[in-house]
Amino acid sequence: MKFVDMTNITVIAGNGGNGCVSFQKSGRRASFLKKPNGSNGGNGGDVWLLADPNINTLNYFHSNCVFRAGHGQSGRSRGCTGKRGKDVIVKVPWGTRVSYKKTNKLLGDMGIHHKRLMVAKGGRHGLGNGHFKSSLHYCKVLNTNGSTGEFQHLLLELLLIANVGIFGLPNSGKSSFIRIISSAKPKVADYPFTTLVPYLGVVQINNYDRFIIADIPGIIKGASHGLGLGMRFLKHLEHCQILLHFIDIAPVDNSDPLENIITIQHELSNYNENLVRKPCWLIFNKIDLLEQQVAEKRINHVISSLKWKGRYYSISSIHNTNVLSLCNSIMKFIMHHTHS
């Protein structure tokens, strides 16, 4: 099934019902004295978005893109108010960003700022002539019509909700890592871009503690100008509490790990400077491919050259080296920052 994380929908609220014009005979001179008793119409139905944690893609909206609420009924005689139009509730994944398509103005992040959000308000009811009656039972203004409901074109963007986000160059071992520690099963192979869509995995530390981790396709130089796959999916890192930058310590193309880190950080900054400000750990992967002293020398060179003040870890996803220790550190970090 195709992974859909961006789509357009149209929402149409219901129109308000018209007010009723009717008269009740009053007294003996019924032909001259008529008491207005027409009632108001009903309000039009609203269109709401509802964040549902059980939905994880926008695939449904690929073939369902127009949502209409019910119209309010017109008022009737003898004080019978028109029935309100039926609301429409549209379920979207937790973490869906909602914007106006034309202006890109943000309406809200579902599940982050809003669990329930009105995106199109129904039209107001019209007034019946009973609303305008006077003490003389004379009505100059007979009635008013209901107003038209709102009509909106919306852009829905899904931002995956994860505690931890993984990024790096293609073939840095991200997918192997997430396969080992979680229930997610991304494709793993010895060629670039084996990860074509984001993956979510749940990492169970013990019976009580767990975290959610997101793996996005690899980022390459020039990604901020449209090259590669990863830039489109960087938005899925925006809600993460911590980022893990995976580095291949022994690249098969003999590229410099230091230059690779600088390249990726530059692309991240071009996309969104707020991502660069997030807590980030360097994860030096594939240490099994080098002798211990060589690996340590390369890592120390990178750390000193970058003047890196954050945490860093050396692991081997294939041999499970230091993986458990890293996961425990991640869990402690999340718990500390969640409750602080």
Curated annotation (Swiss-Prot):
PANTHER family for the chain: DEVELOPMENTALLY REGULATED GTP-BINDING PROTEIN-RELATED (PTHR11702), MITOCHONDRIAL RIBOSOME-ASSOCIATED GTPASE 2 (PTHR11702:SF31)
Lineage, top ranks: Bacteria, Pseudomonadati, Pseudomonadota, Gammaproteobacteria, Enterobacterales
Major localisation: cytoplasm
GO cellular component: cytoplasm
Name of the coding gene: obg
Example of a GO biological process term: ribosome biogenesis
EC number(s) on file: 3.6.5.-
Keyword DNA repair attached: no
GO molecular function per UniProt: GTP binding; GTPase activity; magnesium ion binding
Domain OBG-type G: 162-335
Domain Obg: residue ranges: 1-161
Binding site for Mg(2+): S175, T195
Binding locations of GTP: 168-175, 193-197, 215-218, 285-288, 316-318
Name of the protein in question: GTPase Obg
Record SUPFAM superfamilies: Obg GTP-binding protein N-terminal domain, P-loop containing nucleoside triphosphate hydrolases
Keywords: Cytoplasm, GTP-binding, Hydrolase, Magnesium, Metal-binding, Nucleotide-binding
Organism: Blochmanniella pennsylvanica (strain BPEN)
Cofactor dependency: Mg(2+)
Complex and partners: Monomer.
Gene3D superfamilies for the chain: GTP1/OBG domain (2.70.210.12), P-loop containing nucleotide triphosphate hydrolases (3.40.50.300)
Subcellular location per the Swiss-Prot or TrEMBL entry: Cytoplasm
NCBIfam families for this protein: Obg_CgtA, PRK12299.1
Record's function text: An essential GTPase which binds GTP, GDP and possibly (p)ppGpp with moderate affinity, with high nucleotide exchange rates and a fairly low GTP hydrolysis rate. Plays a role in control of the cell cycle, stress response, ribosome biogenesis and in those bacteria that undergo differentiation, in morphogenesis control.
Annotated PROSITE patterns: G_OBG, GTP1_OBG, OBG
Pfam family, one: GTP1_OBG
Record keyword Nucleotide-binding present: yes
Family per record: Belongs to the TRAFAC class OBG-HflX-like GTPase superfamily. OBG GTPase family.
